[in-house]
UniProtKB/Swiss-Prot annotation:
Example of a GO MF term: 1,4-alpha-glucan branching enzyme activity
Natural source organism: Mycobacterium sp. (strain JLS)
Gene of this entry: glgB
Biological role: Catalyzes the formation of the alpha-1,6-glucosidic linkages in glycogen by scission of a 1,4-alpha-linked oligosaccharide from growing alpha-1,4-glucan chains and the subsequent attachment of the oligosaccharide to the alpha-1,6 position.
Protein name, UniProt field: 1,4-alpha-glucan branching enzyme GlgB
Lineage: Bacteria, Bacillati, Actinomycetota, Actinomycetes, Mycobacteriales
Region of interest (Disordered), residue spans: 1-21
Reaction it catalyzes: Transfers a segment of a (1->4)-alpha-D-glucan chain to a primary hydroxy group in a similar glucan chain
Active site as annotated: D422, E475
Family: Belongs to the glycosyl hydrolase 13 family. GlgB subfamily.
Gene3D superfamilies: Glycosidases, Golgi alpha-mannosidase II, Immunoglobulins
Entries under Pfam families matching the protein: Alpha-amylase, Alpha-amylase_C, CBM_48, GlgB_N
Amino acid sequence: MAKTKGLPKDTAVTPSPHLRPHTADLNRLLAGEHHDPHSILGAHEYDDHTVIRAYRPHATEVAAVVGGERHVFTHLEAGVFAVTLPFTGLIDYRLEVGYDHGGDQPHIHHTADAYRFLPTLGEMDLHLFSEGRHERLWEVLGAHPRTFETPDGVVEGVSFAVWAPNANGVQLIGDFNHWDGNEAQLRVLGSTGVWELFWPDFPVDGLYKFRIHGADGVVSERADPMAFATEVPPQTASRVTTSSYTWNDDAWMTQRAAQNPVFEPMSTLEVHLMSWRPGLSYVELADQLTEYVVEHGFTHVEMLPVAEHPFGGSWGYQVTSYYAPTSRLGTPDEFRYLVDRLHQAGIGVIVDWVPAHFPKDAWALGRFDGTALYEHADPRRGEQLDWGTYVFDFGRAEVRNFLVANALYWLQEFHVDGLRVDAVASMLYLDYSRPEGGWTPNIYGGRENLEAVQFLQEMNATVHKASPGIVTIAEESTSWPGVTRPTNLGGLGFSMKWNMGWMNDTLAFISRDPIHRSYHHHEMTFSMLYAFSENYVLPISHDEVVHGKGTLWGRMPGDDHRKAAGVRQLLAYQWAHPGKQLLFQGQEFGQRAEWSEERGVDWYQLDENSYSGGILRMISDMNGIYTSHRALWSHDTSPEGYSWIDANDSTNNVLSFLRYGDDGSVLACVFNFSGSEHSHYRLGLPHAGTWREVLNTDAADYNGAGIGNYGAVQATDEPWHGRPASAVMVLPPLSALWFEPVAAEAPVVQEPPTAPPLS
């Protein structure tokens, strides 16, 4: 902003013959559909003089202050003003724009001219974007506060850049111009379709949108696809923001880069931030959520999508602002603080990411420039009928760039440790949930979406190279081969995938009355036929506790005592089975009601003497056992880490197996899925000696019946189950027992059971 001493004197000269722009250019400018308004507005030299033009539709007067001299503009028409300066070589100037506010004198606004600044994107940025290879796209598109040193002083403002290649014109609207974009028109840069404008004095925290004059003749007001912050929904404007956050997680980030999460423990609590404890902000969650997951031994938190979404009932899975953490809970820096606090407490952070589809809201990405831009133009590929959403055009370089850069953005700007990619199956198959004749085949006549495959491979290869130690997890519900195979071997390149088969079979089995389970024994053994074909996560996610499916508690047959026993047993089975585990909020203590994003978690169940309290105490203990026993996680992806003891005891409803660690450790796990106690069950073991009972889900501490083995069993050299040794033990009904061998010098503390067996 220019600072003048006293009142600048007015200077008048003979008007230039070039004062008035060509009629066609002027008409396009007035219509808001000029591709290069900078070619008309701003300062332009002609032979021995300079013409400055300004478009200020609501102004009563405009003047340019040059070296202390005030040059008054002539009003040409419809808010277009111009002035002739009798010289060339103009270095700097400021505008004085007068507005009639009803007083004796007009209100004068002093500002730099937006149309005298060079583009804020370089040729290399534009080239990389058009090729789909700009890995830090968020640094060039979107809204960026900038400062320029000029001869007349410092100019502060914000540069705006948006991709809309088929638009006839793009205007910037916001509080700064009372949402009238005529005076703030962007220019297109070359053939890239990127429109750009630097606007002086635009405030950080200011609201804005783009007014797009679409190729279809429709003028629409759009949120910035690259917005880094937004208004709180249901309001839809984008917000200028900048980060001043100082991270304090260097130790975590260094450790992350040196590890492969596939070979590390991962016990994940899945959380919907808005409903975990309704009403909490990011800052409050940083205290309360961190304390909770640390107290109960989880290693990771997985957050349902935090990117901005207009409809809370979508749980975040219909994203409109891919680069903005939801403003419902605070600012982007406050989200950084939440991640930072979790890291400082040793907790990893995974966020759900939704590149498969996006909603059709008229102010968002859909038909952004009047054409199918982000979505595929053919509705047989560009629409997801089940969800009423658009599908990204994965074959378009700029769209792939938008998504790949977005994945990098969350990993690098917010230090998140992983992305759980939603609805991968819907991306991989062209006929996914489509009727016959409602889809088009690929170039080879198949149903595989080759462009989506290429995108997923590119995304995975890029993020793993740029951010070593992060994890990408696919929610992929089919048997697509090689989901977790490296991309250089033809796979999709994910670190892990959800084991939906394990989840479906296990939940079906535990829902049955114990008296019938022996006839469905295969449902619990089948998962081991493919357990090492991919790197798996065992999910009991939000999808399994909504829409009438019930909860873990609700699925269990029997009275409350048996339901609680069943929940404890199931969780112990999940933790012992090869693969990482994920559990949705509330299920860690056996919430009885289905989840509702409007109600949140039923914390009232956590009475110290309740079954829920017992389940949660077991989770806390079990997580501690899990992280301290390498046998439970170091060989999750290898057959070396697993061996059946007996997979075929359907008569007794018992499963048993061994887990091995990369340090030579071993854990014996046995599960009695029947409703009856087995008081003299002989179990084959690798060697004789004392085997400590490290977990008994029926322990009185967990509000179980307290049936057990006095803390340990003695294995003798009697072969059983094909093993050289065996031990006779008590198996409580609906229970899980874990045993580890005890070194001779480590005494076992034996305690009698504290409650009688179930009748």
